[in-house]
Amino acid sequence: MKKIVLAFDSFKGSVGSFEIAKAAEKAIQEELPDCQIIRFPIADGGEGTTEALCSALHAQTVSCRVHDPFMKPIEVSYGIVNNGAMAIIEMASACGLPLIDSSRRNPMKTTTYGVGEMVADALKRGCREFIIGIGVSATNDAGIGMLKALGARFLDSGNGELEPVGENLIKVHQIDISQLNPALKESHFTIACDVSNPFFGKEGAAYVYAPQKGANSLQVIELDNGLRHYAQVIKEYTNMDISQLPGAGAAGGMGGGLLPFLNAELQSGIEVILKTLRFEEVVRQADLILTGEGKLDRQTGMGKALDGILRAGEKCQVPVIALGGAVEATEALNRMGFTAVLPIQPFPVTLEEAMRPEFTKENIERTVRQVVRIIKQFTK
């Protein structure tokens, strides 16, 4: 075996994709010292997106002060590439779930305002091309916070300006974009997301994702009604129907909420990364692709990061083996095309222990070593 590509997503809440790949690389080097190993950390639009792209493109990292989901000041960073022309922004850095303790999470009250501030900062620096990775958000405001930070105003039936939070979507009566940052007319946005959910409904932003952001059952209904109402207001103002657009429900409606007001397109996060970094060229002469994420299940094949890796492997006729902290629906994953799907846990453990970073890295290293030892026996 001469060439192995390591294309791991993060094991969310435990270890990032870079550290996972390093652990796998160590095991391969010990078993196959002459093998070429290419680390290709990936992400699907959520956490790790900026890191993966910026590292591969040798981006300049810049920092700025913005507001978190509860409008508290924080410092964030993002990447600039292409001689200052493109900004790579991770939504989660300004309004991600990890920024809020689980006891304080409430998508009725959170906002994407800080993401808009990041965009405004990049516009001031001269950027006109944007990749925004959306996902792992603590918000359900359909992007009105981001748009407000860029100059938009959202008014109620009495012409009062609304605070851009999830609970106020139902109250939006008018949208005023007359003061939108003029540099946006010269800009293009690629919105990279990791899901295909519609804007509202039983499979939409509120019902599927708001509970993990802290919403109770009544709040889920309120948020969904707000998204329905806001979609209708958008249609009246822009003649664009985002109601059933695949991916519109990503990141609390951020996926669909930006398209009517920006020169933007919504793309699968993993496709953005694989295309930008020319993944197919990397794997074309490989003997094996090793990939993985924290949980492998039926959703793995629904536009998520590993699905993109698998499709690239199939196109280049390279086998793909996936490792997971937890594995469900093994047979279904095999039918999707994975050569093998393996759990990394050596024995039953608590969730807390399974998520411990050092334990995860040890398990990745041990499992990869066993995979390589098996392959060695059949490739002598």
What are these regions (language model features)?
Residues 2-134, 138-380:
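N-terminal loops that bind phosphate or other acidic moieties
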